[in-house]
Amino acid sequence: MSVVTMKQLLEAGVHFGHQTRRWNPKMKRYIFTERNGIYIVDLQKTVKKLDEAYEFVKELAANGEKIMFVGTKKQAQDAVKNEAERCEMFYVNQRWLGGMLTNFQTISKRLNRFYELEQMEEDGTFEVLPKKEVQSLRREHAKLDKFLGGLRGMEDLPGALFVIDPKKEKIAVAEARKLGIPIVSIVDTNCDPDEVDYVIPGNDDAIRAVKLITEKIADSVLEGKQGVQLAE
């Protein structure tokens, strides 16, 4: 039994690719046909590939590995945050800061600063500091929260990345590839599938399509974690 039906994929518009003039020939094997100047993704392949990605992520989660959800384009931001939080994984949905993986030590320092500012607010330090200084610290905290809030509690590199649109997130993809971190991704007809370990061919621009696939990846994490709990 597949984790998603053709009907669900059709209803969410996962089959709509990009205009034929904006395509990557490497995606040819995942394209079913062309309609009104738009490529239509072969959903039978999407079902099969999503099943493979689901199993891979489930296995990782069962082994206690962390998955980082990455999607900074508007259509992906909410799904990435909501689904990563639902399965208690890390996410980046505002902007990928260069070095988030390859220079993780620096990111760790910024995360520690983020925790330090939160602690200052909680333990009453802000109440005894000058108002101007508190305003400045609050601004600093808000900025850190915006860009690093989804990495709260992250102590080492993730076991895999789940990426929405590897073309848009090319820096994240390059960093993961450099470090040998596997990439699971929704790959549209204008992307290069060779950069991704687990390709899920489909529409990465429609909110409903992105939400559906992201939900399934979060489900696979939860199923993997549940397997661990049942084994215990």
From Swiss-Prot:
Domain of life: Bacteria
UniProt keyword Endoplasmic reticulum present: no
Coiled-coil stretches: none
InterPro entries per UniProt: Ribosomal_uS2 (IPR001865), Ribosomal_uS2_bac/mit/plastid (IPR005706), Ribosomal_uS2_CS (IPR018130), Ribosomal_uS2_flav_dom_sf (IPR023591)
Family (UniProt): Belongs to the universal ribosomal protein uS2 family.
PANTHER family associated with the record: 30S RIBOSOMAL PROTEIN S2 PROKARYOTIC AND ORGANELLAR, SMALL RIBOSOMAL SUBUNIT PROTEIN US2M
Protein name (database record): Small ribosomal subunit protein uS2
